[in-house]
Amino acid sequence: KHDATKSDLFDRFEAEVIDRFKQYQVPVIELKKETPKEAVCLVFERVNTGGVALNVFELLTASFAAEDYQLRDDWNLREQRLKDQHPVLRSLQNDDFLQAISLLVTQMRRREALSTGATADSAPGISCKRKDILKLEVADWKAWADRVEAGFVRAARFLYAQKIFKARDLPYRTQLVPLAAMFVDLGKDGETEGARQKIARWYWCGVLGELYGGAIESRFARDLPEVVALVQGDAGEPITIQESSFQSGRLLTLRTRNSAAYKGLYALLMRDGGRDFRTGEPIEAQTFFDDKVDIHHIFPEKWCKTAEIKAGTYNSVINKTALAARTNRQIGGRAPSKYLPAVEKAAGVGAERMNEILRSHCIAPTELRGDRFWEFYAARAEELLQRIEGATGKTITREPEMFRAGVVAEAYDEGPEEWDAEEPLEQALS
C-alpha cells in the first residue's frame, strides 16, 4: 500500500540533502605530471592549514618511492648512527643532510661544465636551496650519502677539537652543512694541521661574527668552494671571513645560550687551554661529561646583587666561565676571596697553581682574590677580546672605558636577554 507520508519524506530528503550534495562544488587543484616538485611543495604548504608540514625531505621521499627507493628507511639508519655516536650531532635534521648532498652534487656539475669550456657565468651554480634539493635523484643519493655521512662524522670530530661536545652548545646547527661538505670535498687534504687551522678560522669567523642566522643557503654555496680553495692555497680570504666583525660592546649583551657567539666564546675558552678548577687538567670530552661542566658565574649572582651590580652586567659572558658542577657548589654565593681558598683545598693545590688555572680562563687572579669586580671585569673583557682576535684573525676596535664602573651604558644593563632556563644558577651557601 502506498504511504504518502513516507514518499513526501523521501522527496524532502532528496531535495534538501541529496540535491545539495549534487550541487556542492569541491575546490580542486590539478597538478599535472610536468608540474615541478617545488610547485607541488608550495601548493601543499599554502592549502594545508593543519597537520604536519610537507618539508623538502617528505616530498623527496615520495619522489624516490616512485622509483621504489625508501629514502626514509635509509635516512633513519644514518640518523641513528650519527646521533648515537656523536652527541654534538643530535640536533641534525634530515634537510641538513640533503643540503650537504645538494651542495656537492651542484658543485660537481659546475666543475664538469667549467672543464668542458663553459664560462663562470654560464656554468650551473652551486646551491642547496629547496628547488635544487628537489632535483636530486636516487642515483645522487646513492652516490653521495655514504660520503656525506662520513663528512658529518669528520665535522663532529672537528667540533670536539674546538671543545664543542653537545648539540646544546653548538653555536649554529646550520653551519654543520658547509662544514661537512668541505670535509667531503677536501678528502685527505682536509686532514692536515694546516687545513684544520684554516677551517677553524673560517668557523670562528662565522660563529663570533654571528653570520649563520636566518636565510643562509647563499652563504653555504659560497663557503664550500671558497674555503676549499683557501685550504688548497688557490684563493684569498672567503667572503665569510671578510664579512666577520665583532664589536667590543657585544660582550656586554652576550648573556645566554640564545646567542651563538655566547656559546662560541665559552667553547673557545676551553679550546685555548681553560683548565678544570679541581683537577687542573684541560677540559676534554670525558672531563666535560663526567664532571658536568657548564657555564657559571665567576662573581656569584648573590654577591653581585648585594654589591648592587645590575643583572645586565653580572650576567654577561664577561662574568662567566666553564666550571664543573662540584666546583660551582663550592663557590655558592660567596665572595671570590672566600670561595677560592675552599676550591684550592678541595683541589689540593696552592694559590700559585690556582692562579695559573684562573689565567687559563682569562681571569686576573689579583683582582678576583681582592673582590674587585670592576677591575676584574675590565681586565677579563680585554683578555676575551684578544682570544676572539686570535681565533678570527680580525682586529677589534677597543672602547677602553666601556667596561668600567659607572660607565657601562644603561642600554647594555637594561633588558637582559631571556634567561636560559636550562642553565643552572648558583645555589647560595649559608
Description of each model-found segment:
Residues 108-186:
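Structured, charged N-terminal subsegments at the starts of enzyme catalytic cores
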Residues 207-295, 303:
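Intrinsically disordered, low-complexity N-proximal targeting/linker segments that flank membranes
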Residues 1-112, 116, 166-167, 342, ...:
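Basic- and aromatic-enriched surface patches that contact anionic nucleotides/nucleic acids
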Residues 42-46, 98-107, 174-185, 200-205, ...:
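Short, hydrophobic/amphipathic alpha-helical patches that form generic packing surfaces
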Residues 313, 331-359:
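Polybasic, low-complexity binding patches
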Residues 351-430:
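C-terminal, well-folded lobe of enzymatic/effector domains
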